[in-house]
Amino acid sequence: MGNQGWAPDGLDDLSDEPPQWIRVGVAMTPPAESIGGSATGPTSAQLDAFCRALAPRVGLAVTAQGFSDYRALLAAINRGDADLAWLPPLVALRSASAGRTLPIVLPIRGGAAWYASALFTRAGSGVSSILDLRGARVAWVDPQSTAGFLVIRAWMRSQQIDFNFAFGQQTFYGSHAAVVQAVLRGEADVGATYAHLDHDLQHVRSAAWGTAHVQIVAMAGPIPNDVLSASIRLPVTTIRAIRDALVRQDEALRVASAGLLNAEGFIAAETEHMSPLMKVLKHLDDTGRRATSIFPAR
């Protein structure tokens, strides 16, 4: 299947046998960094409430199982021991591109289901585009930050931009707030952080810099908040039922989703949400990264 498309309506059933139940897999370790999600890992009570609310909407029993990290969760998916998985965007896309899972819905937080990685500078700094960078001091969040390091660097590689030419001093500041302050105080010429996008996926509606006056130098995305992915072993009719139940939630499922994922709702995962990130996937430099949380580091 590869990455030929994300919408289950366009796929043939890969399994003819209806499942007896649906097994939801989650990584239980608290997140290292979360934007809009929970600051702690999921609880058993929250997982149970979500499963109870989803079950009558899909007409199947729904159970949950916790895993130590995403590698263990994906291994269970590959063995056929889990059917659904909450995944960070990069993990979800790699699994989908390998033909193992299918992204089906994205959670909405703060009115949006995605964000972007933005490279920004102070207003009036004289840097207006990526071509203006020559030995610039750059502020990163940390080596595991999707928006604050990984994605914008991957995008720059895809544009054949030479890091050794563009950047001089490179510093990890540990948080998005610290990156913003480093740029605004003049400690760094540019910094990388998150920016929430409007529904057109082009315009910034809010960002880590708040109301400060900044100049966006480059932006890469959209990046989904996180992704509910289904095993390709599930019949497409079951995947559609799960997708439709989450997109058109009843009150019980809405409350359970808010409790578990801090989600206001869900949208169906479409190719337009995923393809920009897929294009830079091979340029990522996160080899050996071990993600552990139900909510992705951003």
Question: Where are the model-predicted features located?
Answer:
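Flexible hinge/capping segments at coil-to-helix
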Residues: T121-D142
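Pocket-lining segment of extracytoplasmic ligand-binding domains
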Residues: R137-A139, P143-T237
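Periplasmic-binding protein-like
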Residues: P19-R23, A27-T29, G110-T121, S206-R243, ...
